């Protein structure tokens, strides 16, 4: 009998999506075949500390996290603690299910690469670029991928644009967003000067850089899942809208996404024309490659009333809860959650093998003589 593949399943983190991450990770745990995989859960606490696998498993299976972690020493608060903990588990592949900070921003991917162990998903660079809404939009614009008009405001700007200036540039309805947050944290819909000032104060709590973008009037919210490294497969396109709203009448705040999502409305496949479906798919694949994403992603789009499609934002560590769109989209294509998890691990090994063939060092011509100088008088 072949040895089981040892999987480190990372979840939690210090973002607002800590509990969502638990639900995602538990579904991955349940999806992976126990005859083939031995899974070692690794919790990252709300303080950003890596917890031992035995305690982590108890949290994953529903025991009270705060009670279990009370009094535990902060022994993993330095860089060597987490590395030693992971190495001691002798893991074959690392599977992050940490949303928001530490996960989607590339922190864990950087640690995993430093350890030279295969891991699921994108590398540090793709995560970090995709997590920053401003950099993402700048890259999309340069590469001809349609997105909404925007401006950028920094906290230390001495002359921040007032509402009159913003509304003249972007229109009477805008969104103010913290550049490096997920799950609609630090996001406000703004229609007047008072709301604008309040939105700036709120969003600057979460980031020193803000994105202010033109709203798409009554948009259809669309999304597509992507799986792959260099070769990418796409899911059917889905449409969704929030509880209590008509199709195309609202936007998703944190409450819609995580507190009251049991009544979320879906339409898979979305009722858009074949031509628009192809256009969106092409935009998604191009964005995936421009951003350097590996493994998987969900990319969100907005379609205006006149059929114009705008890329909204990518998600490089999409959720895996019962209500998460990425797994639902691929289930609609006939790929169940076990097959999805298996594919992600396969892609992790493939990408690791590819990276091992890349040389990151070189011997400069004549470098053996560096430091030797022939000084002529």
Curated annotation (Swiss-Prot):
InterPro entries: ATP-grasp, ATP_grasp_subdomain_1, D-Ala_lig_Van_CS, D_ala_D_ala, Dala_Dala_lig_C, Dala_Dala_lig_N, PreATP-grasp_dom_sf
Compartments where found: Cytoplasm
Pathway named in the protein's UniProt entry: Cell wall biogenesis; peptidoglycan biosynthesis
Keywords noted in UniProt: ATP-binding, Cell shape, Cell wall biogenesis/degradation, Cytoplasm, Ligase, Magnesium, Manganese, Metal-binding, Nucleotide-binding, Peptidoglycan synthesis
Positions bound to ATP: 167-222
A GO MF term: ATP binding
EC number: 6.3.2.4
Cofactor: Mg(2+); Mn(2+)
Recorded GO CC terms: cytosol
Positions contributing to Mg(2+) 2 binding: 313, 315
Residue span(s) of domain ATP-grasp: 137-346
Catalytic reaction equation(s): 2 D-alanine + ATP = D-alanyl-D-alanine + ADP + phosphate + H(+)
Presence of keyword Transmembrane: no
Ligase in keyword set: yes
Residues noted as binding Mg(2+) 1 in the record, renumbered to the chain: 300, 313
GO process annotations (BP): cell wall organization; peptidoglycan biosynthetic process; regulation of cell shape
Cofactor note: Binds 2 magnesium or manganese ions per subunit.
Entry-linked PROSITE patterns: ATP_GRASP, DALA_DALA_LIGASE_1, DALA_DALA_LIGASE_2
Function, in words: Cell wall formation.
Similarity field: Belongs to the D-alanine--D-alanine ligase family.
PANTHER family in the record: D-ALANINE--D-ALANINE LIGASE, D-ALANINE--D-ALANINE LIGASE A
NCBIfam families: D_ala_D_alaTIGR, PRK01966.1-4
Protein name: D-alanine--D-alanine ligase
Organism this protein belongs to: Oenococcus oeni (strain ATCC BAA-331 / PSU-1)
Lineage, top ranks: Bacteria, Bacillati, Bacillota, Bacilli, Lactobacillales
């Amino acid at each position: 009998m072949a040895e089981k593949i040892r999987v480190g399943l990372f979840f939690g983190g210090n973002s607002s999506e800590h509990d969502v991450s638990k639900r995602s990770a538990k579904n991955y745990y349940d999806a992976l075949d126990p005859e083939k995989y031995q899974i070692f859960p690794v919790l990252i606490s709300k303080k950003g500390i890596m917890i031992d696998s035995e305690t982590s498993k108890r949290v994953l299976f529903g025991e009270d996290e705060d009670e279990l972690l009370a009094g535990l020493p902060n022994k993993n608060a330095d860089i060597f603690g987490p590395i030693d903990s992971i190495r001691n588990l002798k893991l074959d592949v690392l599977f992050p299910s940490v949303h928001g900070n530490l996960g989607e921003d590339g922190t864990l991917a950087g640690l995993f690469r430093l350890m030279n162990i295969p891991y699921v998903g994108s590398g540090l660079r793709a995560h970090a670029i995709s997590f920053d809404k401003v950099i993402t939009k700048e890259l999309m614009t340069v590469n001809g991928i349609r997105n909404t008009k925007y401006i950028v405001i920094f906290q230390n700007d001495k002359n921040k644009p007032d509402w009159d200036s913003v509304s003249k540039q972007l229109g009477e309805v805008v969104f103010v967003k913290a550049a490096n947050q997920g799950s609609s944290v630090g996001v406000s819909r703004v229609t007047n000067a008072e709301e604008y000032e309040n939105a700036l104060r709120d969003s600057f709590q979460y980031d020193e850089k803000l994105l202010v973008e033109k709203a798409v009037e009554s948009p259809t919210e669309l999304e597509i899942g992507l799986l792959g490294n260099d070769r990418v497969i796409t899911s059917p396109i889905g449409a969704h809208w929030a509880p209590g709203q008509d199709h195309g009448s609202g936007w998703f705040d944190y409450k819609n996404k995580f507190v009251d999502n049991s009544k979320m409305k879906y339409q898979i496949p979305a009722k858009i024309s074949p031509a628009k479906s192809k256009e969106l798919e092409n935009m998604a694949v191009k964005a995936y490659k421009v951003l350097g994403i590996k493994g998987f992603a969900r990319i969100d789009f907005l379609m205006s009333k006149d059929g114009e499609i705008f890329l909204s934002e990518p998600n490089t560590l999409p959720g895996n809860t019962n209500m998460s769109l990425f797994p639902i989209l691929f289930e609609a294509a006939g790929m169940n959650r076990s097959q999805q998890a298996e594919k992600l691990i396969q892609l992790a090994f493939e990408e690791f093998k590819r990276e091992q063939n890349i040389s990151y060092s070189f011997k400069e011509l004549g470098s053996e003589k560096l430091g030797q100088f022939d000084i002529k008088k």
